[in-house]
From Swiss-Prot:
The lineage of its organism: Viruses, Duplodnaviria, Heunggongvirae, Uroviricota, Caudoviricetes. One of its GO terms (cellular component) is virion component. Residues 4-24 form a coiled coil. NCBIfam families: major_cap_HK97. Keywords: Coiled coil, Late protein, Viral capsid assembly, Viral release from host cell, Virion. This is Major capsid protein. It comes from the Viruses. It comes from Klebsiella oxytoca phage phiKO2 (Bacteriophage phiKO2). InterPro entries: Phage_capsid (IPR024455), Phage_capsid-like_C (IPR054612). Belongs to the HK97 phage major capsid protein family.
């Protein structure tokens, strides 16, 4: 095509020269012998160039008729760009677990899975640098996200217990055991001297192991919905055990000493009268007595709240007066007598000789501290067994499952005993 354009420009130039000679002839009437020779030469050049252009154009038309379309496969390879993974609280923990499971515990492959399949470079880097004995050590920032999520699931955390670091697994917190006193005195008389007495709240890390079975059909798959399934299973396993530990464990078997054991130790129990009728008046009076016991203990009551069984909660929620009005309508907003209320299955409703009793916990959770060691480890197994909800030993291999083991360490302590009240023998 460029050659044809050049020939057209040449032919146009020759035509201008021919037209100039023709103008001379038209004006003067005759051309000289030299001009006639030039005219004949230019005319021949014009004819030759035109013929050459005709041949070149014919060649291009013929080539176009027999040309084949370019196939799509002749293009360069497509560039596939994976979408950025969705970020949410707990995403790091979930993707670490999924990567370790997909790689069957091989940390090098797990880091590659996080990078290539999940497209999360930060998780890949965390796996590469967090190897430790007994599993993969979860980085502190990811561990903090898990604690934040547990706050909405564990009622002790939800009601305001404060989480503090537990360096090296131990900590002693000073607490006021006996307050200083004040007195009046007359002129020229000595004031009575008194001082506050302190002792320590000692926290020692207790190891909790959560076994989380995951279907092998989910392993190796990426996606937000799969991640949510894995995350919820992990949080449920941890939160259910934490509720029981923080409220009802007694320190045996390397467990924390929970609220019930401390309330018993400090004589902060308020039993329901066994012969009392269960009705609106007796229930309301009993709840007032629990609050009053906390007040009379000079509790600061900065962040007081209720914890109770599901049965007790529903009894109070559905309690109505003689006009059919709900007695405690504020429970719809999560409050009871002006204080936050939470329920949990970790508080039984089948206690006592007849299996009909339950418990009500009332505490100033501002004085409840949960010491977090900060070390959380994750490990994987395809052959291990676990105990299901019925207490039966289950083989993960026989159920086409894999087990994720999450190891964390913590303890619970209470800075002021007077802020804790435990209602026992509750029949509603």
């Amino acid at each position: 095509m460029p050659q044809i354009e050049e020939l057209r420009r040449q032919r146009a130039g020759i035509n201008e020269q021919i037209q100039a000679l023709a103008t001379i002839e038209a004006t003067n009437g005759t051309l000289t012998a030299e001009q006639l020779t030039e005219f004949a030469g230019l005319q021949q050049q014009f004819t030759d160039i035109s013929a050459k252009m005709d041949r070149m154009e014919a060649t291009e038309r013929a080539a176009a008729l027999v040309a084949k379309p370019v196939k799509a496969t002749q293009h360069g390879p497509a560039v596939i760009v994976k979408a950025e993974p969705k970020q949410y609280t707990g995403a790091g923990m979930t993707r670490m677990v999924m990567s370790i499971a997909a790689a069957q515990g091989n940390l090098q492959d797990a880091a590659k899975f996080a990078s290539d399949e999940l497209n999360d470079q930060s998780v890949s880097m965390a796996i590469s640098t967090a190897a430790g004995s007994g599993g993969v050590l979860i980085p502190q920032n990811i561990h903090s996200e898990v604690i934040e999520l547990l706050r909405d699931r564990t009622i002790v955390r939800k009601l305001g217990a404060r989480s503090i670091p537990l360096p090296n697994g131990n900590m002693s917190l000073p607490r006021l055991a006996g307050g200083a006193t004040a007195s009046y005195t007359g002129e020229n008389q000595d004031a009575k001297v008194s001082e506050a007495r302190f002792d320590d709240v000692k926290l020692t890390a207790k190891t909790m192991i959560a076994m989380v079975p995951i279907s092998n059909a989910l392993i190796g798959r990426a996606g937000f919905n799969v991640e949510q399934l894995v995350l919820q299973d992990i949080l449920t396993a941890i939160s259910v055990r934490e509720d029981k530990a923080f409220m009802r464990d007694d320190g045996t078997g390397d467990t924390p000493i929970g609220m019930k054991a401390r309330a018993t130790q400090w004589n902060r129990l308020l039993p329901w009268a066994a012969d009392a009728a269960v009705n609106l008046d007796t229930i309301d009076t009993y709840l007032d007595s629990i609050i009053l016991m906390s007040m009379d203990g000079n509790s600061n009551m900065i962040s007081s709240g209720w914890g109770m069984s599901n049965r007790t909660y529903m009894k109070l929620f559905g309690l109505r007066d003689g006009n059919g009005n709900k007695v405690y309508p504020e429970m719809a907003q999560g409050m009871l007598k002006g204080y936050p209320i939470q329920r949990t299955s970790a508080i039984p409703a089948n206690l006592g000789e007849g299996g009909k009793e339950s418990e009500i916990y009332f505490a100033d959770f501002n004085d409840v501290v949960i010491g977090e060691d900060g070390n959380m480890k994750v490990d994987f197994s395809k052959e291990a067994s676990y105990i299901d909800t019925d207490g039966k030993l289950v083989s993960a291999f026989s159920r086409n499952q894999s087990l994720i083991r999450v190891v964390t360490e913590h303890d619970i302590g209470f800075r002021h005993p007077e802020g804790l009240v435990l209602g026992t023998g509750v029949l509603f």
